[in-house]
Amino acid sequence: MIIEDFEALKHWLSKTLEPICDADPSALAKYVLALVKKDKSDRELNALCIDQLDVFLQKETQGFVDKLFDAINTKSYLPQPDSTSTAVVKLDSFEHQEKEIKKDEVNKEEEKEKKAPRRLNQSPQPSSTRHKDTRENRKRSNSDRESNSIQNSFRSGLPEQKQDVDAAPPRLNSNKVQNAKNTRSRDDRKRDDRFRKREYDRNVPRRDSYRDRYNRRRGRSRSYSRSRSRSWSKERQRDRDRSRSRTRSRDKDSGKPKFDLDRPDPVDNSYASGSSVPHIGSAHFPVPTLSSTITVITPSHHGNSSAENWPEFHEDQVDHSSYGRLQMQKKRCRDYDEKGFCMRGDMCPFDHGSDPVVVEDVNLPGILPFPAPPPVLEGPPPPGLPPPPSLLTPPPVNLQPPPVPPPGPLPPSLPPVTGPPPPLPPLQPAGMDAPPNSATSSVPTVVTTGILHPPPVPPSSLFPSAAAAAGPIPLFPETYEADGYNPEAPSMTTTSRPLYRHRVHAQRPNLIGLTSGDMDLPTPREKNNMRIVVDSESRKRNLGSGDCVLPSKKPWFDKSNFNNRMNPGFQKKPLFPNENTKLELRRIPPELNNISKLNEHFSKFGTIVNLQVAYKGDPEGALIQFATHGEAKKAISSTEAVLNNRFIRMYWHREGSSQQLQTPGLPKVVHLTVPQQPNLSVMKQSIKERLGPVPANNSEPSVAQNINTETTQNIAKVPVKERLGYMSKTVSAATEKVFSTSTGLTKTVYNPAALKAMQKSVLYPICNDNGDAQKKKQEALKLQQDVRKKKQEILEKRIETQKILISKLEKNKNMKSEDKAEILKTLETLTNSITKLRDELKAVSSTGNVVKNNKSKAQMQKELLDTELDLYNKIQAGDDVTELRKKYTELQLDAAKRGILSSGRGRGVHLRGRGVIRGRGRVLHGRGRGASVHAVVDHRPRALKISGFTEGDREYLLPHFAHFGEIEDCQIDDSSLHAIITFKTRAEAEAAAVHGAQFKGQDLKLAWNKPVPNASSTEVEDADQEEEEFHEDSIVDDSLLQDDDEEEEDDNESRSWRR
């Protein structure tokens, strides 16, 4: 069936089904719509609908289906357009509403006008004409506001005429609305603005960005200019009204309560000019002591101000980076990505990702310093800056005081309490926009006045340890400059702050997981955007002569790399010298990692001097050296994929890169070469650990012990290579005590992933030496192999010549005696040389075997574990592992033969208690108290013949049986698919026979493999066995009797341990 509008039909169906059906009408409407959509004839659809809907509608089914098909055919389900009539009705109702609202507003204004003379009794020259003008203005504003509300409601009532935000509203034909719109005055618009601002201040959480407000104000100012240009007489009238109302508002403000100044009266319709700011600034307001310095939002929040109030507030003073978060995405921080940390911390203008680790490190060496604040006099603001908004408005009333810290001893890292806390430093000037930062401060927005008043001294009961702290001689000089009050590290001093010193962020220390996307940092420093950062170094406490925990540091400015743009800690690029000609390849598939393939690809870029496959023992690595740097650069900058494989990585090869990566600015994790400089472990501390009372001097060793234990726990897991003794030197990690204070502004952001890479490079600087040694070994082996090949060739040639000479002698029997003697002499020398060469070759091969056999158990185990790890990683990555699995099986067999795959890795047979396993007269005792077992040669078979496994399971067979004991030998026949595994002892072979039959869900066929002995040896063995059996039985009987005596003695002993 043809349906024009599915949504309309669905709406009609749900409306029709609601009275006749108990089910959900909307769901049933969807179901009916699905039935009607089917590609069938009308008759079939009718029958189908009746059949399917009978369950839901029962008696109403036939009527509903007829009605449905009739509606679809006649299209009566489509909505009928009757917008013109509804519009007319709505317009009439709006006009009626407008009259009622106008009456109410006029009554309210008259009541306010009666009250106005009482408040204006201090004005110098009240006049009746002024009241008349203001009444006329109010009436005009009321009519204008009502016309606006009519337009808005009319626009929302017509869905067909929805328009964009920037589009003009639809024009009404009503003369009344048009006249009201034309007569709208600037004063009434300003009152609307103030009303909107007041609503904005009440709903603080839903604050929009400064740009939105600024654009909105600009849009309104454009409309003002349009309306202003329409009439010269209106402009003159407006100027007269403005001058009158300005004097009236000044008088009115003087009589207001002090906290109502930021809420202007509705009748105030004037703009405060820039010249009026200093007069208002003379008012004094009490400053509540709050817990942190806060940033001011914008001057547009305050009642008496708007964009025109601030003549010095220009576009170029606004820091667009702080609020234009969508206009340009931040670039990634190079230091954070490459080195693993950024010493600028949350003051870095670049992106540190979604979850950086932020650590407060005021006293850490290598932190990027910031210049000390310039000397500032307490007085008016700098000439370039507009007056701070703190001179205009007092703090909002709705703020609550900060939480008081609990009573208890102060941390010793804080200075002694000698007076009341310093007043809050003033905040950012009005020209700088800083939105509220929920990630960095937990205190609500505060505006403070510019005049410093010492706040009242807090009650001494809150800080009982204040007197005790001030009692002894202070360790720190009085020049220490205290920070603003911080509830997490409270401190009180009498030193006051300079008036116009601004803090960019007031952050709690050691915040972990700060999102740098939430930090809106002002990056470009333009004309009057002055950012003064306090140097944390100047506020550090200087230790006394008696305390020698921290060494005296060299000042930042004396260091050679201070403020040096060529500092290697902040290089933009890793510098590769122009003479570098080596390229390193990684992730090459093993089948492509051969000399011919690599030479074929890289020879097109230039002359290859050296080519190494399986570089540094990595089967997927290679090293290629070109003749010149240009050729290497051409190869690395080529867009063509290496061997047509995009997964192959190519790098510049750097000699000794692991030592070069460590820079002076790095927090050194482990030092192998310079043990004098202590390393710093990155520790996560809780708030209690940071703020809790630290014991005095006598507890320093215990603190150092705790730090040592934490360091050992925090060091990354020891890799397999190091566990197996691969590292020749032990890593000694010294720790340094770090005193963390909350007064610093610098924070270091750590990137754990990059730091791991750095730790690897620092932990293994010996790898280069090992690589050189391996190179030398490989070269020596190559030479040996070449010599051996040449000797083999010489040997073969001499054997051939010997054969030729012998055949010549046999054929030419009538040869002369002289020739025959010469040939015999030559044959003799040939045989001597051949035997000599054979001996030499045997010696070389035997020494090679000795070297192979001399592999230590640890090396074998390391190699096996490395291969197992590579196999696991490749299986996880989905790569081809056939070659690697073969190598792993060979290593397993070799390890099993040497007894490395011992029973300790799996289930073994353990004897305990008083059980006896007896066979052929031999007894193994397993008494719980460790009685010695008599060792006897066991001639029973230790080899198992295994069959019944598939070809795919052949590789896993050896590891399966290696769990039961040490394997001496393993022979797997590929053709008949049976294996013979020989265990070291009979007991292990029996355990494998009992428990090893189940393999991968199938039963293996196991049998003892008995070797066929010689007849002579069997007779001798039988005789020996008889003697052994007789001798052993007597020994066993004696030992058994002895054990019985011991048991009797045990029975007589006291059983106190059993209770």
Swiss-Prot record:
Residues 98-114, 130-147, 184-213, 232-266 have a biased composition (Basic and acidic residues). It holds the Pfam family RRM_1. Residues 1019-1031, 1040-1052 have a biased composition (Acidic residues). Residues 98-275, 375-443, 1010-1059 are annotated as: Disordered. GO terms for cellular component: nucleus. A zinc finger (C3H1-type) spans 327-355. Residues 771-873 form a coiled coil. Keywords: Coiled coil, Metal-binding, Repeat, RNA-binding, Zinc, Zinc-finger. Residues 434-443 have a biased composition (Low complexity). SUPFAM superfamilies: CCCH zinc finger (SSF90229), RNA-binding domain, RBD (SSF54928). May be involved in the turnover of nuclear polyadenylated (pA+) RNA. This is RNA-binding protein 26. It comes from Xenopus laevis (African clawed frog). The lineage of its organism: Eukaryota, Metazoa, Chordata, Craniata, Vertebrata. The gene is rbm26.
